[in-house]
């Protein structure tokens, strides 16, 4: 079973929490680390329990808190190489061990959660 919770949605910032039996992930981190922590705490999720952050694209309303939350809680980040290259202000602050690339249309796993990324033209 999957649980979803939209933490933030809109032009000011986007972040989605997804939970499976063994995985807890954030899809985008478009608000500050502090606001994302508060939102997670409000749904009784410990931010240090997050297994991964998936980045959909490099717009500020999707990555604002990326480097801070990844660094603070030592959370691996997953994105395409092109997305990483387009957000150097964020990625330069990430621990190298937490940088993970994926390719569109190639599934991968985060714990028991299968992820199948795709591109939208």
Model-derived features: positions:
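Conserved beta-strand hairpin/beta-sheet module of binuclear metal-dependent hydrolase folds
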Residues: 1-43
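Short, flexible loop segments at the rims of nucleotide/cofactor-binding pockets, characterized by
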Residues: 3-6, 30-32, 53-56, 117-120
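A generic structural signal for short beta-strands and their flanking turns/coil linkers
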Residues: 14, 23, 49-51, 71-73, ...
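Short, solvent-exposed polar/charged micro-motifs at secondary-structure junctions
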Residues: 15-16, 57-59, 108-112
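Divalent metal-coordination and catalytic microenvironments
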Residues: 18, 28, 57, 77, ...
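Active-site metal-binding motif and surrounding structural segment of the metallo-beta-lactamase
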Residues: 34-83
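Metallo-beta-lactamase
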Residues: 81-121
């Amino acid at each position: 079973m999957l649980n979803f919770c939209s933490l933030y949605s809109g032009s000011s910032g986007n972040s989605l929490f997804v939970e499976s039996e063994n995985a807890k992930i954030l899809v985008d981190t478009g608000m500050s680390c502090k606001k994302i922590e508060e939102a997670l705490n409000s749904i009784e999720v410990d931010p240090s329990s997050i297994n991964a952050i998936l980045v959909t694209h490099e717009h500020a309303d999707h990555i604002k808190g990326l480097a801070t939350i990844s660094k603070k809680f030592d959370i691996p980040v997953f994105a395409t190489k092109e997305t990483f290259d387009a957000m150097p202000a964020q990625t330069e602050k990430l621990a190298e061990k937490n940088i993970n690339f994926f390719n569109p249309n190639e599934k991968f796993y985060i714990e028991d959660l299968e992820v199948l990324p795709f591109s939208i033209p």
